[in-house]
């Protein structure tokens, strides 16, 4: 039996013919990185290859390593293996990895979403023989409304809080949803304050040439009256810590795909939940897989067992693959343990939570039945994010990443 072009090893996805790994979870010689979230981009490898938008983020999070970069659809050769990056739409710089060797084509999706969010690049379906896909929201209860509707709901919520003299604290991961939210909030005309972890990502992107809305860094000496009626963006792990008390009186809004399940809002003890995700929903996953025309699909992190089983039932050869992806993903981290207090570094640390799927109480038991639909919540919105692309990094040998 012929050896697979990509092998599943204890270090990660390995292309033996090209002698490189894709998103390895242990140090390796050469790491090809799909995007800068920490479950896909880990320190310690000898060299890294990524999209040039990802490079400043990797530099922020991983530090000083040899980075090689490329743009989308710009092939490079690694020991005779043709490798190219293609837009994944997940976060800034996120890319699918196309690998071609001796007439065989594999695509590693990394994390992806199919809706154009105005900043992450528009997802590009890539035809292949074998497709390795995520399945974070691989159940039919997860179906997203348009970003414009979600932004309209967020804008209305912010306006109501402002009228009541309350600060709007939006919980969103520092790399991804935080940048998407800036355009929505900018449309309100209110000042925007960022938690240290979000601010660090913001500055790395601005320094790399991205045109982003003006913001303020939440600092210990910032007069508290400046926050009143305005907007704060913070990672979800900051909720329930002493840091957040400086914004009193405030309301908390959680931005997450998990808010599709009503019980999760109650567990978070938040004032509002907005179903905003940087991952594809059920329909998005299926549409992408069909568009690839892949003969075989490997399903990684998420609801991989249920999703791979469904693919098999509809006639697509699919296999479940255990990986270490998702352990510090911006979606899965948000629901780890709502009662556990994170480390409380209010200025810099991105407070980490390992991966855990939502608990299945009486309101989430529907997750056990992929064919049963859950009534959708009414959380929606609209506000265009300025689609501004930065000047491209002309250096082909540098690269960055962040979560």
Where is each model-derived feature located?
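Long, charge-dense
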Residues: 193-211
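Short, polar loop motifs at secondary-structure junctions
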Residues: 24, 34-39, 52-57, 72, ...
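Active-site regions of enzymes building and remodeling cell-envelope glycoconjugates
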Residues: 29-35, 45-52, 63-71, 80-83, ...
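Short coil/turn segments at beta-strand junctions that form active-site/ligand-binding loops
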Residues: 29, 46, 104, 165-167, ...
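C-terminal regulatory/interaction regions
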Residues: 219-345, 355-356, 361, 368-372, ...
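Cap/insert and terminal regions of metallo-dependent hydrolase folds
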Residues: 115-196, 256, 260-329
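His/Asp/Glu-rich metal-coordinating catalytic cores
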Residues: 2-17, 21-26, 30, 36-171, ...
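Short acidic low-complexity segments
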Residues: 12-25, 74-77, 214-230, 236-244
């Amino acid at each position: 039996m012929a050896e697979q072009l990509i092998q599943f090893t204890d270090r990660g996805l390995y292309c033996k013919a090209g002698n490189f790994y894709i998103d390895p979870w242990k140090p390796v010689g050469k790491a090809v990185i799909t995007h800068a979230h920490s479950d896909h981009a880990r320190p310690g490898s000898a060299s890294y290859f990524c999209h040039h938008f990802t490079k400043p983020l990797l530099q922020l999070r991983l530090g000083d390593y040899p980075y090689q970069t490329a743009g989308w659809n710009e092939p490079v050769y690694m020991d005779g293996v043709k490798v190219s990056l293609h837009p994944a739409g997940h976060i800034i710089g996120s890319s699918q990895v196309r690998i071609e060797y001796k007439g065989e084509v594999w695509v590693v999706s990394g994390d992806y979403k199919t809706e154009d969010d105005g900043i992450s690049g528009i997802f590009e379906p890539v035809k292949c023989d074998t497709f390795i896909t995520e399945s974070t929201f691989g159940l039919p209860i997860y179906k997203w409304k348009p970003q414009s509707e979600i932004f309209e709901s967020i804008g209305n919520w912010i306006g109501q809080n402002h009228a009541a003299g309350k600060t709007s604290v939006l919980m969103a991961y520092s790399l991804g949803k935080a940048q998407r939210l800036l355009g929505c909030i900018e449309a309100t005309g209110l000042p925007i304050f960022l938690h240290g972890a979000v601010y660090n990502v913001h500055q790395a992107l601005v320094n790399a040439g991205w045109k982003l809305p003006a913001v303020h860094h939440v600092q210990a000496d910032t007069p508290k009256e400046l926050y009143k009626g305005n907007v704060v963006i913070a990672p979800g792990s900051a909720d329930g810590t002493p840091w957040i008390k400086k914004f009193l009186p405030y309301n908390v809004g959680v931005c997450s795909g998990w808010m599709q399940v009503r019980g999760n809002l109650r567990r978070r003890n938040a004032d509002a939940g907005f179903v905003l995700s940087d991952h594809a929903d059920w329909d998005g996953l299926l549409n992408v897989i069909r568009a690839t025309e892949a003969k075989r699909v490997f399903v990684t992190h998420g609801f991989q067992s249920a999703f791979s089983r469904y693919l098999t039932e509809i006639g697509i050869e699919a296999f479940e693959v255990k990986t270490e992806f998702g352990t510090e993903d911006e979606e899965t981290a948000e629901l780890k343990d709502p009662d556990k207090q994170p480390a409380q570094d209010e200025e810099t640390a991105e407070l980490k939570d390992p991966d855990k799927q939502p608990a299945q109480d009486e309101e989430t038991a529907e997750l056990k039945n992929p064919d049963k639909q859950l009534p959708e919540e009414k959380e929606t919105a609209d506000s265009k994010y300025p689609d501004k692309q930065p000047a491209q990094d002309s250096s082909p040998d540098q690269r960055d990443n962040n979560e």
